[in-house]
UniProtKB/Swiss-Prot annotation:
It is found in: Cytoplasm. Has three domains with a flexible linker between the domains II and III and assumes an 'L' shape. Domain III is highly mobile and contacts RuvB. This is Holliday junction branch migration complex subunit RuvA. SUPFAM superfamilies: DNA helicase RuvA subunit, C-terminal domain, Nucleic acid-binding proteins, RuvA domain 2-like. Belongs to the RuvA family. Residues 143-153 are annotated as: Flexible linker. The keyword Glycoprotein does not apply. Homotetramer. Forms an RuvA(8)-RuvB(12)-Holliday junction (HJ) complex. HJ DNA is sandwiched between 2 RuvA tetramers; dsDNA enters through RuvA and exits via RuvB. An RuvB hexamer assembles on each DNA strand where it exits the tetramer. Each RuvB hexamer is contacted by two RuvA subunits (via domain III) on 2 adjacent RuvB subunits; this complex drives branch migration. In the full resolvosome a probable DNA-RuvA(4)-RuvB(12)-RuvC(2) complex forms which resolves the HJ. The RuvA-RuvB-RuvC complex processes Holliday junction (HJ) DNA during genetic recombination and DNA repair, while the RuvA-RuvB complex plays an important role in the rescue of blocked DNA replication forks via replication fork reversal (RFR). RuvA specifically binds to HJ cruciform DNA, conferring on it an open structure. The RuvB hexamer acts as an ATP-dependent pump, pulling dsDNA into and through the RuvAB complex. HJ branch migration allows RuvC to scan DNA until it finds its consensus sequence, where it cleaves and resolves the cruciform DNA. It comes from the Bacteria.
Length: 201
């Protein structure tokens, strides 16, 4: 069983990405392959779920362990297969989904592909009350997003906000901000270039 893969994102298609490591390219199915577009040609860590059938072995990829956990929980629901589960979490924002499950909002759930009224009720029946850890983690993460630029210099704050606008996640930025802050009196452009160098190491 694979937990994650770390390698170069070589190819991005509408259905999957290819990550190369050890001179082997791994085809990984993801809910939104184009969310990896900014990482194309660079090293990325992708969390994995290996799905085995008699006629096929597939790797499904996720950008966080929370997404993967929710995917596995959805697979435990009768009537939900890997492609349906992946489509449900493709937005990358699991909080509204879990909120809908907890509040028994089957109308919200039927907005997802291949989820009818019966399947929506089954999701609620099987998963309500079992996803608290995931939603708590995501809420804490989102609350931290609001504080990411607190206490930074104007130039560094501008650089961080620009990097967010380019699609870099709060998780990625929080790893490099302490190192960026050690460099005093840089322009916003210089901070951006520094961040890009740090994130590709």
């Amino acid at each position: 069983m694979y937990d994650y893969i770390k390698g170069i994102v070589k190819t991005i298609t509408p259905e999957y990405i290819v990550v190369e490591t050890g001179q082997i390219g791994y085809q990984i199915i993801t809910g939104n392959p184009f969310s990896f577009q900014r990482l194309e040609g660079t090293e990325a860590q992708v969390f994995l779920y290996q799905h085995v059938r008699e006629d096929n072995i597939s790797l499904f990829g996720f950008q966080s362990t929370e997404e993967r956990y929710l995917f596995k929980k959805l697979l435990s629901v009768s009537g939900i297969g890997p492609k349906s589960a992946l489509a449900i979490i493709a937005s990358g924002d699991v909080v509204p989904l879990i909120t809908a499950i907890e509040s028994e909002d089957d109308v919200y759930l039927t907005k997802f592909p291949s989820v009818g009224k019966k399947t929506a009720r089954q999701i609620i029946l099987d998963l309500k009350g079992k996803l608290a850890d995931v939603v708590a983690s995501e809420i804490v993460y989102k609350a931290a997003e609001n504080d990411i630029v607190t206490g930074l210099s104007p130039q560094l704050e501008e650089a961080v906000l620009a990097l967010e606008a380019l699609g870099y996640s709060t998780r990625e930025l929080k790893k490099v901000i302490p190192k960026m802050a050690k460099e005093n009196d840089l322009t916003s452009d210089a901070y951006i270039k520094l961040a890009l160098r740090l994130m590709t190491k």
